[in-house]
């Protein structure tokens, strides 16, 4: 009896999560027109560009190394900045906690179409333990790398907005065409 009840509850849970469109977060399905693109960055071997390249590859995007190609879309990583602000302090006035902010500016150039700007911001808090200076530095490096990976994931997910904005633009152009023809 207990086994049947467990099977029933498990089956209902699977049906409910599948029915509502829930999916485990995995790779992002990049639109077909962005399945092949040029990745352009001022620091092509830097940690942020490597993280973006890795996320694109995980999403089955073919990265072309020829930056002179004008017939395929181009993802340009324009700039990134890391800032660190004090969030709280100890009684003696030393910093107890930081908020680290990573901001990434990029743009996608579609051949023969518009330029689509993308911006990603990632926030993290970091506890500054003055008693463990070496461990603090190692932990801060790990947090920075996680922030870069998270920014790269968000950037790849934002590629979906380009497809959506192109569809809206195409719909607007198609609805404007019959209206203009009727006026003539």
From Swiss-Prot:
The keyword Membrane applies. The keyword Lipoprotein applies. InterPro entries: LPS_assembly_LptE. Residues 1-19 form the signal peptide. A lipid is attached at residue 20 (S-diacylglycerol cysteine). Keywords: Cell outer membrane, Lipoprotein, Membrane, Palmitate, Signal. One of its GO terms (cellular component) is transporter complex. A lipid is attached at residue 20 (N-palmitoyl cysteine). It is a lipid-anchor. Belongs to the LptE lipoprotein family. Together with LptD, is involved in the assembly of lipopolysaccharide (LPS) at the surface of the outer membrane. Required for the proper assembly of LptD. Binds LPS and may serve as the LPS recognition site at the outer membrane. This is LPS-assembly lipoprotein LptE. The gene is lptE.
